[in-house]
């Protein structure tokens, strides 16, 4: 006798194909750059990365007169915008002052570039923290002339080295 053919299993109904649309991911650095777009376009402020940190680098030309640690009043709206950008981001905030390698004048209230860099970081901290929801997130540091980003042998290089960095950890490191 011939065996009966096996019962045919009905196939499941066809599932419509859904095309996956790749939605671009807005990264943390993109959010910060967007929040500071006007300041970046105006010059003197950049947003980049350094190791596990996102760094808002502020040129000294926006901040201080040569050899001074008293903020220029025109930095106030920039400080407010930096605080607004960072209010939306998690984690601690470090404000780090940097100088060129030109020693402070003997008449200066600052005995070293390290002292000047710390005083400048504290001045930026005071203005930015004033605008933050949680000012306790902020710590300051000064590096003096120890972390140049350009050649101190040229005027342009020295100008680039005079800066304050506002740093936050990349969110994936928290």
Segments predicted by a language model, with ranges:
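Periplasmic peptidoglycan-binding/anchoring modules of Gram-negative envelope and division proteins
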Residues: 29-46, 56, 67-97, 101, ...
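A generic structural signal for beta-strand entry/edge sites
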Residues: 51-55, 163
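Short, aliphatic-rich beta-strand segments
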Residues: 54-63
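Periplasmic OmpA-like peptidoglycan-binding domain that tethers envelope proteins to the cell wall
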Residues: 63-73, 98-174
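Extracellular/lumenal/periplasmic "stalk" regions immediately C-terminal to a signal peptide or transmembrane helix
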Residues: 1-48, 74
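Generic, low-specificity signal for short hydrophobic/alpha-helical stretches with a mild N-terminal bias
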Residues: 18, 29, 38-40, 46, ...
């Amino acid at each position: 006798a011939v065996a009966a053919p096996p019962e045919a299993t009905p196939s499941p109904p066809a599932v419509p194909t859904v095309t996956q649309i790749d939605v671009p991911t807005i990264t943390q650095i993109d959010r910060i750059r967007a929040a500071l777009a006007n300041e970046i376009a105006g010059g003197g402020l950049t947003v980049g990365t350094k190791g596990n940190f996102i760094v808002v680098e502020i040129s000294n030309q926006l901040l201080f007169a040569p050899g001074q640690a008293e903020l220029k009043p025109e930095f106030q709206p920039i400080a407010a915008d930096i605080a607004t950008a960072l209010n939306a981001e998690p984690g601690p905030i470090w404000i780090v002052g940097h100088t060129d390698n030109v020693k402070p004048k003997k008449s200066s209230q600052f005995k070293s570039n390290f002292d000047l860099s710390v005083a400048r970081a504290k001045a930026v901290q005071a203005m930015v923290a004033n605008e933050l929801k949680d000012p306790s997130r902020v710590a300051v540091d000064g590096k003096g002339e120890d972390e140049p980003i350009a050649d101190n042998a040229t005027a342009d290089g020295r100008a680039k080295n005079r800066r304050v960095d506002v740093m936050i950890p990349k969110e994936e490191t928290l």
